Amino acid sequence: GTGIASNIRRMLIEEGASEEEAQSKLFAFDVPGLLVDDTPGLTEPQKLYVQKRSNFATWKLESPGTITLMDVVRNARPSVLIGVTATNGLFNAEVLGQMAKNDERPIIFALSNPTSKTECTPEEVAVATKGRGLVATGSPFTPFMYEGKEFVTSQCNNMFIFPGVGLGALVSKASKITTKMFLQASKALSEFVTDEQRAKNMLLPDLTNIRKVSACVAKAVAIEARESGLGRILSDEELDRVIAKAQW
């Protein structure tokens, strides 16, 4: 979870946010609740994402002393939830319904595997958000119908990123793989989702396009390697050719 938070924080800063602004937008949880400055037993990675308890003095809490997920969803009004908790049902109807009040198209990542441990199911998101929630899961789910519309669930899997990152590093002869390469890979992936796929509430491309996705990701990584002085100086056109030649 802290690894995900680290990359989101880096992306926010890349997009122009200050370190303080980026930090303020991230609310990290563990078993005791929201990670705050007086949470006992914090690990070193967790300490990077604690909030000051004093920041929430005016919040209405479900239980004094503990800041729950529902407390944050109701008071901070986030638009994105990311679950890697292996806690089935954590994103319940109340939480999902509040997310739909926070944003017209709330984004829900229920990434825990297997399905018996997922934070919520895609159908639960559809019902609680009246079809407006965008969801991706760690486990595969079959398409379903809600209110006469087909919903296709994106499986958030490293197969969309890792092969392309490896290919991009290989063709560019990158001396190392950096966090920024992964950020550029993520941007390339996000731009690959079509309007038709978004209409089905998909957050990621269809798996049938995985070869093209990997080539697109590879090019983004190779360009970053070139721009950062870590890889070969090849034009965009040359990169297209060497990437196509390297795939099989």
What are these regions (language model features)?
Residues G1-T2, L34-D37, G83, N88-N92, ...:
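Flexible loop/turn segments at secondary-structure boundaries
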Residues G1-V80, R232:
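Glycine-rich phosphate/diphosphate-binding loop of Rossmann-like nucleotide-binding domains
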Residues G3, F29, G83-T85, N102, ...:
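Generic beta-strand/beta-sheet core signal
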Residues A17, Q23, K60, P64, ...:
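Alpha-helix capping and helix-loop boundary segments enriched in small/acidic/polar residues
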Residues P106, A110-D236, V242:
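Adenosine-phosphate binding glycine-rich loop
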Residues Q247:
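Active-site loops and adjacent core secondary-structure elements that bind or stabilize anionic groups
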